Amino acid sequence: MNTRQSSFSYEEILICGRGEMFGPGNAQLPLPPMLMFNRITDISETGGPNDKGYVRAEFDITPDLWFFPCHFMGDPVMPGCLGLDAMWQLTGFFLGWLGEAGKGRAISTGEVKFTGMVTPKTKLVEYGIDFKRVMRGRLVLGIADGWMKADGETIYKATDLRVGLFQEKAD
């Protein structure tokens, strides 16, 4: 029976950001302001469209977030690359949560589509990562599709998100 934790609070994901969750030299999340979600609401190594696992997370949007004043002055919009980065962050977190070793690095994505935007009027962003494959060899590689919703409407989709875990070579 799986006894892994299936959700994480903001305080718990900050522990991961400090490198204290999965052990030294292993996957960690960025710290604020680059951390792009406030909580992981559900994570499982089974289920999802491919029955290979999934992650669900949320980000509370407030008008005072750091990116709104500079992107763009007079026309504030969350940069699309931050939503994409959140998907990579969650993909890497999943690999560490599985117990895999190494530092997480985004490798690539297939196709990305933006069909809406996050503005200061948005209240909640939701993320979904649906795994297609986890490869465990010299390199641990997670491959997943992702989506992002703003107030319930899907506005970003990404296919074939790839994150690898890399172990440092001994000198």
Curated annotation (Swiss-Prot):
It comes from the Bacteria. One of its GO terms (cellular component) is cytoplasm. The active site is at H71. One of its GO terms (molecular function) is trans-2-decenoyl-acyl-carrier-protein isomerase activity. Transmembrane segments: none annotated. The keyword Ligase does not apply. It holds the Pfam family FabA. Belongs to the thioester dehydratase family. FabA subfamily. Homodimer. This is 3-hydroxydecanoyl-[acyl-carrier-protein] dehydratase. The lineage of its organism: Bacteria, Pseudomonadati, Pseudomonadota, Alphaproteobacteria, Hyphomicrobiales. The gene is fabA.
